[in-house]
């Protein structure tokens, strides 16, 4: 656990001039905003540090890595071998990869994606990919398989505390 605290002080002059009601209310609102902001920044830190090798998990690897070691030997990846911008192909590949994730004994665990998490810069791309009934960016009349198959039943959410403009994440069940 981590204790986070912030406070404000009112001067004796403010008390004598009966300014404590007005100042106290304003400062209290500012403290509440500051705490809400801090909670969001700390919550987003897991994703913001997901590719940083300075922040490792129990296996000695960052959260998103191409070489998580398996107890039975071998490795497992939960990020693409080659970085890819968010588009139909990269999203389909990510969903396929998720469906073939394995446990520490290298057995498929049959995960499904439930929600995509994107920074503000990708919200329009995410909306087109998940809400269109037809394929995005083609003149063909093909269905949007991601939408049609309900591959991300909870849709997407925009996290305003993700500074990387092209990183996207998929929450699983």
Range-by-range predicted roles:
Residues 2, 13, 53, 61, ...:
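Flexible, active-site-adjacent loop/turn segments at secondary-structure boundaries
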Residues 6, 29, 114:
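Residue-level detector of short, conserved catalytic/binding motifs and their immediate flanks
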Residues 64-104, 110-115, 121-173:
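Sequence/fold signature of self-assembling virion shell proteins
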Residues 3-6, 45, 110:
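Core alpha/beta catalytic barrel or barrel-like domain that forms the active/cofactor pocket
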Residues 1-26:
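Long, hydrophobic/aromatic-enriched structural stretches that serve as scaffold segments
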Residues 18-26, 33-97, 152:
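Alpha-helical scaffold segments that mediate packing/assembly in large oligomeric complexes
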């Amino acid at each position: 656990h981590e204790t986070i605290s912030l406070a404000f002080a009112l001067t004796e002059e403010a008390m004598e001039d009966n300014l404590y009601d007005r100042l106290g209310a304003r400062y209290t609102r500012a403290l509440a905003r500051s705490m809400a902001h801090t909670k969001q920044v700390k919550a987003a830190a897991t994703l913001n540090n997901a590719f940083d090798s300075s922040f490792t998990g129990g296996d000695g690897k960052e959260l998103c890595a191409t070489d998580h070691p398996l107890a039975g030997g071998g490795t497992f990846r939960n990020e693409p071998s080659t970085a890819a911008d968010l588009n139909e192909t990269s999203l389909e590949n990510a969903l396929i990869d998720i469906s073939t994730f394995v446990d520490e004994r290298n057995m498929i665990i049959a995960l499904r994606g439930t929600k995509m998490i994107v920074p503000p810069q990708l919200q329009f791309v995410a909306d087109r990919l998940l809400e269109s009934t037809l394929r995005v960016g083609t003149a063909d009349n093909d269905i949007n398989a991601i939408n049609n198959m309900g591959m991300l039943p909870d849709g997407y959410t925009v996290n305003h505390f993700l500074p990387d403009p092209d990183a996207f994440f998929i929450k699983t069940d």
